[in-house]
């Protein structure tokens, strides 16, 4: 229901997934007093986005207003839910309290300062970020298995396995920005020397912008 609401109001069904992905680790760090936090890659640099942080291997969780408020798209999740309950028939009667929405909201600043948790670092500044090699590592060491079929909108079987919204998310981004999942994958693999530019172009023509099931 939240994903449908976010699609209708923001054009982004993936919104709640991103909120949880970004904020949940910080909540856990506060709970267990973990001061050193690593995310995987800075997607803004590895794929496409704002290059403002290209020389900074971390995000400042206290001072960076884009991190604090930007992901919320100007609307705290509780306000969005209140709007949905009042205006959307499919959300009528939904029971949702603050604790239900905790991990969709940024952590408390004062608690972060008190515990000395103020930054999250990106692994791609310390190790070469190679998505294909990351997959091989996980397959060898954690038993990760690829999908039997490729991910929608691209050719790989080991990326975009998070949930069933991925294909739809990348399709929406493709029709809005002309940037799909396949162009991200091919660009990285061309830079990593795994495929040629011509091979990448052929893959993009075949898979980028694929309508999801």
Feature map (PLM): residue ranges:
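Nucleotide-activated chemistry modules centered on ATP-dependent adenylation/adenylyltransferase
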Residues: 1-213
């Amino acid at each position: 229901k939240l994903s449908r609401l976010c699609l209708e109001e923001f054009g982004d069904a993936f919104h709640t997934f991103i909120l949880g992905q970004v904020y949940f680790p910080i909540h856990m760090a506060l709970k267990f007093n973990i001061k050193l936090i690593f995310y995987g890659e800075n997607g803004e640099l590895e794929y496409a986005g704002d290059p403002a942080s290209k020389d900074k291997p971390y995000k400042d969780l206290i001072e960076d207003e884009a991190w604090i408020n930007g992901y919320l798209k100007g609307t705290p999740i509780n306000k969005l839910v209140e709007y949905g309950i009042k205006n959307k028939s499919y959300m009528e009667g939904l029971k949702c309290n603050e604790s239900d929405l905790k991990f969709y909201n940024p952590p408390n600043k004062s608690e972060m300062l008190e515990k000395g948790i103020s930054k999250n670092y990106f692994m791609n500044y310390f190790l070469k970020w190679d998505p294909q090699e990351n997959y091989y590592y996980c397959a060898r060491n954690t038993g990760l298995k690829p999908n039997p079929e490729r991910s929608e909108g691209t050719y790989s079987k080991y990326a975009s396995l998070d949930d069933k919204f991925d294909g739809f998310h990348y399709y929406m981004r493709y029709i809005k920005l002309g940037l799909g999942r396949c162009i991200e994958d091919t660009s990285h693999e061309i830079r990593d020397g795994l495929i040629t530019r011509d091979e990448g172009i052929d893959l993009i023509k075949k898979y980028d912008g694929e309508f999801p099931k």
